[in-house]
Amino acid sequence: MMRITLTVILRAVFGADGKELERLRETLPPGIQLGSKLALIPVPQWDWGRWSPWGRFRQYRREYDAIVDQLIDNALADPNLDTRDDVLSLMLQSRYEDGSPMTRPEIADELITLLAAGHETTAATLAWAVERLQRHPKLLERLIADLDSGSDELLHATILEIQRTRPVIDVTFRQVKASALQIGPWTLPQGQTIVASIGLLHADETVFPNARRFDPDRFLSRAPDPAEWIPYGGGIRRCIGAAFATMEMRVILRTLLRNYVISPSSARDERWQSRGVAVAPSRGARVRIQPRQGSAAVIG
């Protein structure tokens, strides 16, 4: 799943192909994984160079910047730049209010932010989808029948329920900007950081009856309330790539289920494990699959 989602985002966001695509595939995953771990610990006062994890991360960043520079050169030399729809090309054509373009470092920073936020999280959600479906064979049968009939209504509801029960980002942060904020009996001062638990909200029985039960049918009859279902966060800070991620997951799962048979499993549910940016199945959501009769059986 990581390779599939990485390829999708590299092409859609970076406009990468050929050797640049392969170089980014090699450089970005270890760099992002290392960076997400380093973000949780203080930077040391001494610079140990390439012998330290910070030195290795800086080397990853230099390699990444060089590849993005080449992608920018390629895009600027493309006579069809104004018709391209990848995010890199759109950034190159955008202008600030004063008419100035984005600088190359700014573009590189924006691209890595979009990738770091949207690659691993989508892959982790897809892994949870496989983990859940192989443990719910009746739902799996219904899903395949629904897809074969030309509908993906149940698939959409299933993705919503997977994101409710297995949110890959468990908390979201906000900071008080007003002079004070009243929440119930508490008065929070300006500058106070608030941590909201996505997992606790999604497990609230008053919001989702039988919350511990994995039941996609709950979303067949109603759309999720954006104040209650928040795997992408909420408000003006809601994930900018939410629609893209949802579409990507629907396409990948539809392709998988139409072309492969997933073997049911009676194994215990997999535990949550941090994989850097996102929380994923502890055993990697391993599954046995075989091609469906008459399918092309190609994915990834």
For each feature predicted by the language model, list its residue ranges.
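Conserved cytochrome P450 K-helix E-x-x-R motif and the immediately C-terminal K′/meander segment
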Residues: 149-184, 205
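Cytochrome P450 heme-thiolate monooxygenase catalytic core
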Residues: 1-124
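Conserved cytochrome P450 K-helix/beta-meander segment immediately N-terminal to the heme-binding cysteine loop
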Residues: 196-223
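Cytochrome P450 catalytic-core helices
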Residues: 5, 119-146, 242-260
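Cytochrome P450 proximal C-terminal region
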Residues: 26-30, 149-150, 238, 243-300
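C-terminal domain-closing interface element
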Residues: 53, 57, 66, 158-164, ...
